[in-house]
């Protein structure tokens, strides 16, 4: 029923983008359309895919966001990135299936709010990207006799969201790699108990080891000749780009207070923050971004020094953000065409240790009667430590 309403009252600013090409950020492979970039996951030259061109949305549309349902806003935001790879009706259906839960904006204290992204089926913000990608891949593979294998590395919530999003999707197998002893018991059960087309493998190492194994698999000619591989990490554009939906949603809810809006983003592999930057590039008038990490502080150090020097991963209580060498940061640099001054103008970086994280959780509960998990607390530790 909603689909018919949208067709009847469709935004007058909607355009049909015939093609969107994605270039490798290593610049040694030919550009691909959305479909091929999603299926391949990573470019043959080992680079991450990035859209060749991003056209800002109409100012009239941006100024009238509050008049539209989130499904319509999501369609307008993602449409140009899909191009002609998915028909409009199908894309709208995918968006409806993806965004079937809310993102409440909860007041913590004056001018400080929590955008709750844990109301999806696995209680992880990655439910949005995983569900969107699963439905895109299902559409792309529906007339094929060849099965697709989705290979994913996880530090916790990605694996659970991907397992749930892809469970029983026809023609697709999922293999999840997770570091031994470094994810929660609940997340481990979410990944290992579904069965069916979902396989979860424990790796004796850290998340960066799992991620490196995934990257090597994509570059193994013998393996890819036998299996059609793709990834469901945020290196995949269909997992990464839909995350901008809730930046639009959060902005609309916060904008009623008529104050500049800053997003403090707890960050690990930096796909979420990068999606927010794409929303900003589309015209969403976000004032500033705060990139907040645990003691795996590669990006905050870079923002302070201009030197990008990854360190080995360190285990923390915010385990899903234990990433020493975040893959998506190269995309963030591309957003600003590798201009450090522009990047630093829009993003500030901060890191917090476990003690500061625990203090934040304690203080927020005592002052506001609000319970935060260690990951969300990283985003507020700048204020409450």
Give residue spans per PLM region.
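Charged, compositionally biased N-terminal leader segments and the immediate start
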Residues: 20-45, 315
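Small-residue-rich anion-binding loops in enzyme active sites
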Residues: 48-123, 194-224
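Well-ordered mid-protein domain cores that form the structural environment of catalytic cofactors
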Residues: 114-168
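Short glycine/serine/threonine-rich phosphate/pyrophosphate-binding segments
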Residues: 127, 133, 151-164, 184-185, ...
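Active-site/ligand-binding loops adjacent to catalytic centers
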Residues: 187-235, 239, 291-378
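Domain-scale recognition of functional cores that engage charged ligands
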Residues: 212-216, 225-278, 284
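Conserved small/polar residues in nucleotide/adenosyl-binding loops
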Residues: 383-385
